[in-house]
Amino acid sequence: MKSSNKKKQINATLIDYGEGIFAIDSGYIRKEFAAIHLVVERNKVAVIDTGTNFSVANVLEALKTLNLTKHSVEWIFLTHIHLDHAGGAGKLMSVFPTARLAVHSRGVKHMINPKKLWDAVINVYGLKTALQQYGEIIPIPGDKIVEVGAGD
């Protein structure tokens, strides 16, 4: 496949990089500060990182804009479990009934039971700021998670 270096701004929060690769502005902190990525092939979608709970609306809007449904999302991949990248994972998993979550083996326990992660965030930011920045973290059932490690 020949690569295209042209990016196309579809709307205020969605960029098309071509060949089924899209970036969604997560809305975290300020405009164009952090992105969620979609990889789309044959109407099947992989979401790379989730942003925060407040990013979910932008993901759903992007899918609608691309004429995709919540059943199109097969995978959510987390690059790491910092809340600006993975804080919305539980909420997104609840929206996408057939999706599976791929996360590094060290992050699995925190996605199943985010209490330790959430407590650490509250310790750093305080409860009010943590809720304003990330929203409350939603646990993910273990049977929806695929553990990945080095080399996977």
Report residues per predicted region:
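General small-molecule cofactor/ligand-binding pocket signal
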Residues: 22, 102, 145-148
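Active-site metal-binding motif and surrounding structural segment of the metallo-beta-lactamase
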Residues: 57-103
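Conserved beta-strand hairpin/beta-sheet module of binuclear metal-dependent hydrolase folds
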Residues: 11-66
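Metallo-beta-lactamase
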Residues: 111-152
